[in-house]
Structures are given as structure tokens and as C-alpha cells.
């Protein structure tokens, strides 16, 4: 459709977006609510699955850089490129927010259909970053 035309089609793909934790349905929101309700434990999985966590601010910065250029097109991952276990990220969240709540590991079984690791390749974004510098 775009062949021979002056068009740049970009499909930006974000991964596990962190931030704005009071206004979404993430596990982080649920932990905040449980802590606010005075709960001392939070039912959890094994936490072993790994995800590409990115702050909403970093994601916004990456999207802006993608949109300001037209040399790299197609599907562009806006991500960190680093898989981090859910347990590690949630424990960090609890610590960073000084929450008095402990994870109840194994209360929920890991879902067999979840991928053990999901993260993005930064190859295309790094090309954009190299051009920007």
C-alpha cells in the first residue's frame, strides 16, 4: 500500500508498562489497595515468569523519539530489552513504596499457558537512538 509513496508506517509495541498505579488494574494496583486496606499478605504466584517492565515515562520518551523520525518503520518495540522476574519487580515495588505487605508465594499456581519470558528486542529502537545522538 505504501510502496513508492512518501509514507512511514510505524507500529509501536509497548510491553509491561509501570506507573500510574492507582488508575489501572495491574498487580501493582492490587497490592497498593491491599496494603491500604491493612492486609499483611498478598496472594501471589511463584513470580518466576519474566517480563520487560518499562515505566510509563520511559515509554513516552521512546514513543516520542520514534514519532520524530521516519528512517525506521514497521513494528518498533518500545521496551528495555531486559527480562525481569515478576517477583523481583513486585518486591522492588513493595520496597520502593514502603508497603508493609508480604507476598504469599505459591498461593496461585502459575498458569501453564503463560510464556515463561516475554521481552522486546531493542534493535530497531537502538537504530533510532543512534540517529538521534
Residue ranges and their predicted role:
Residues 31, 62, 69-110, 121:
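Mid/C-terminal beta-alpha module of Rossmann-like enzyme folds, strongest
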Residues 34-38, 66-70, 128:
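Generic structural signal for alpha-helix termini and adjacent loop/cap motifs
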Residues 56, 87-88, 105-132:
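Conserved C-terminal active-site "lid" loop/helix of NAD(P)H-dependent oxidoreductases
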Residues 1-50, 56, 93:
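NAD(P)-dependent short-chain dehydrogenase/reductase
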Residues 28, 56-64, 133:
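Short, amphipathic alpha-helical "lid/cap" segments that border enzyme active or binding sites
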Residues 11, 53, 83, 118-120:
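Short aromatic/basic micro-patch
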Amino acid at each position: 500500500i505504501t510502496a513508492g509513496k512518501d509514507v512511514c508506517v510505524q507500529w509501536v509495541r509497548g510491553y509491561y508498562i509501570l506507573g500510574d498505579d492507582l488508575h489501572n488494574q495491574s498487580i501493582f494496583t492490587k497490592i497498593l489497595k491491599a496494603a491500604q486496606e491493612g492486609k499483611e499478605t498478598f496472594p501471589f504466584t511463584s513470580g518466576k515468569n519474566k517480563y520487560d517492565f518499562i515505566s510509563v515515562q520511559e515509554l513516552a520518551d521512546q514513543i516520542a523519539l520514534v514519532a520524530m523520525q521516519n528512517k525506521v518503520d514497521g513494528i518498533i518495540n518500545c521496551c528495555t530489552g531486559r527480562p525481569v522476574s515478576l517477583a523481583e519487580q513486585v518486591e522492588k515495588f513493595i520496597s520502593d513504596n514502603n508497603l508493609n505487605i508480604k507476598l504469599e508465594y505459591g498461593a496461585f499456581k502459575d498458569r501453564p499457558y503463560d510464556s515463561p519470558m516475554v521481552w522486546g528486542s531493542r534493535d530497531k529502537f537502538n537504530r533510532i537512538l543512534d540517529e538521534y545522538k
